[in-house]
């Protein structure tokens, strides 16, 4: 798949704010600061498409990006960020679970996992949740460039044993065009 056009479309703080377009949605989920926005910028080839920050919890809305005028990339707020109040945390959790459970346009959930910490409890819980829902999901091991080759292999093996139902597992660095092309090839299968 080649991305020729990508632009921010809308942010939603509630289900009522979701776009009405009935086009495929590929959802990017993961812990806070795992690199979701960086990955979206890398995939689209547009620096600054999705706002990035070194501060965890910066993405606080469901952000939709229209790609090739044919489908959405959806950037979810990260989970596991504790610096928000309990009420805010519960509101996000309800919004995200309702969105993932009820949104029929979702064709794939891409779960980003920090390759330096591939066995986090919150990531395993998300894998179990997606498996329970029967949602197709793939795993992207981010920040791959920060590992040695043996650490990459170990991280991948951990994910292969944890995510038995994953459609794919990709080791990803935003500096690698090979990883980008591999991931785009997987995503192309979910754009109907």
UniProtKB/Swiss-Prot annotation:
One of its GO terms (molecular function) is GTP binding. SUPFAM superfamilies: P-loop containing nucleoside triphosphate hydrolases. Keywords: Cell cycle, Cell division, GTP-binding, Magnesium, Metal-binding, Nucleotide-binding, Septation. The lineage of its organism: Bacteria, Pseudomonadati, Chlorobiota, Chlorobiia, Chlorobiales. InterPro entries: G_ENGB_dom, GTP-bd, GTP-bd_ribosome_bio_YsxC, P-loop_NTPase. This is Probable GTP-binding protein EngB. Its cofactor is Mg(2+). It comes from Chlorobium phaeobacteroides (strain DSM 266 / SMG 266 / 2430). Necessary for normal cell division and for the maintenance of normal septation. Coiled coil: none annotated. GO terms for cellular component: cytosol. Mg(2+) binds at residues 37, 59. Gene3D superfamilies: P-loop containing nucleotide triphosphate hydrolases (3.40.50.300). PANTHER family: ENGB-TYPE G DOMAIN-CONTAINING PROTEIN (PTHR11649:SF13), MSS1/TRME-RELATED GTP-BINDING PROTEIN (PTHR11649). GO terms for biological process: division septum assembly.
């Amino acid at each position: 798949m080649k991305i020729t056009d990508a632009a921010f479309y809308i942010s939603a703080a509630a289900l009522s704010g979701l776009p009405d377009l009935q086009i495929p949605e590929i959802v990017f989920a993961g812990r806070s600061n795992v690199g979701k926005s960086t990955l979206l910028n890398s995939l689209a080839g547009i620096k600054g498409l999705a706002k990035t920050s070194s501060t965890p919890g910066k993405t606080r809305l469901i952000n939709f990006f229209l790609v090739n005028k044919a489908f959405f990339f959806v950037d979810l707020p990260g989970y596991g960020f504790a610096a928000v109040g309990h009420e805010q945390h519960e509101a996000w959790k309800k919004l995200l679970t309702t969105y993932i459970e009820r949104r029929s346009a979702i064709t794939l959930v891409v779960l980003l996992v920090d390759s330096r910490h591939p066995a986090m409890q919150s990531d395993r819980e998300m894998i179990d949740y997606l498996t329970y829902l029967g949602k197709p999901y793939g795993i992207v091991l981010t920040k791959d460039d920060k590992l040695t080759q043996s650490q990459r292999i170990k991280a991948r093996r951990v994910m292969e044993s944890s995510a038995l139902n994953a459609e794919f597992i990709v080791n990803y660095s935003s500096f690698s065009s090979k990883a980008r092309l591999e991931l785009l090839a997987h995503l192309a299968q979910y754009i109907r």
